[in-house]
């Protein structure tokens, strides 16, 4: 009974330990497994051959060039890469065939290799067991191949490669990576790949680096009598062809030729108009003229007679409205510059006749007065007989008061003389003068005063400036009696300056 109890206690203890271990394992995460790797069992049984192999092919203790810097590696049994699971050991070799000297020797080596196991290959190989290098072809065989190939020339300049089967070719057995490394380390086959060496020594299948395939060997045929200069020329020709192909691949420029000269396209619609610049408005400071337009029936007659030239005469005091006229204008509905009526021909400008001089009888030799201004008189024969009798009563005339002769003291006569002088000075400034100043621009065009003179633009502008300055001076003389004497002096200076040559 005691034994059964002990067995039951042991079984319960084992069950409890198993349950605890399962619970602990369930609590563990993958991160814990990575942080605390399980201890791996290492094999204690190592053969002497593996020990020798590890001594010969001992891996480096550290990785000098790695992403993590200098990292120590595990021993050779657990060797693994840091990035992948690749072990870095080649298990099989590539099967190649080579030319042997004697068939019997190869058969003996083959049988010996077949008899030995894979572990026998790991033993060091003696010099006698190494494969011997093939013999170079003789001159007789080379000349024979040359004579055969001269009949059939290749189209290209490249050398021909002729592959023929070899009877005594035997394949090489599969080697381990360790044994292959040992063989190559002791006696490696160095290829003659330098160009200077190839020019001096005749090429063969081994010298050119082309070993025989599994089905047979290969012989390398070349043009032996070709000189170095010809080879250089062929290389240059090849380079030229490459350059030409590169140049031809570039798209050339496209040139176009036009046989006809370019012509301008005619407009669909064209109009030609005279250039008429705008005329600035009349200045407010410009003085008004003494003439005004008569309202009523006289406007129709003025429009009919605007084309006729108007004679200019010096006039004195006028009593009738028929004697009052205005400057005739043309094209009153639209504004035109003074250059529109200018004749286009300049030759006639120099050969034109001189203007007529005024008569000496009509000149006023006395001092200048305010009423002695030039007036344009229109001859109206049809309208004078009907309009004179009706408008005599409506017109304003200067009233001249005659001073009666009185016998008084000298003091009274002096006072009367002073009054007469003041009345004479202000006598002509009446309502008629105000009407003339206010209605001077009615029906007139600015800039057309000198349109009928036939002058150039520069001369017309100079004349307009002169008339403008004179009209300002006379207007100031009329409006301000204090400036009358000064105005007379300036007019005298202006007439002296404009007398001529």
UniProtKB/Swiss-Prot annotation:
The modification Phosphothreonine is found at residue 403. It is found in: Bud neck; Cytoplasm. Residues 11-20, 148-158 have a biased composition (Polar residues). The modification Phosphoserine is found at residues 138, 208. Phosphorylated by CDC28. Residues 1-78, 102-133, 146-165, 267-286, 338-366 are annotated as: Disordered. Its main location: other. Residues 46-55 have a biased composition (Basic and acidic residues). One of its GO terms (cellular component) is cytoplasm. GO terms for biological process: axial cellular bud site selection; establishment of protein localization; regulation of protein localization to cell division site. The keyword Cytoplasm applies. Keywords: Cytoplasm, Phosphoprotein. Residues 275-501 are annotated as: Necessary for the normal cellular distribution and bud neck targeting. Present with 6490 molecules/cell in log phase SD medium. Interacts with NAP1 (via the central domain consisting of amino acids 143 to 362). Copurifies with ribosomes. This is Protein NBA1. The gene is NBA1.
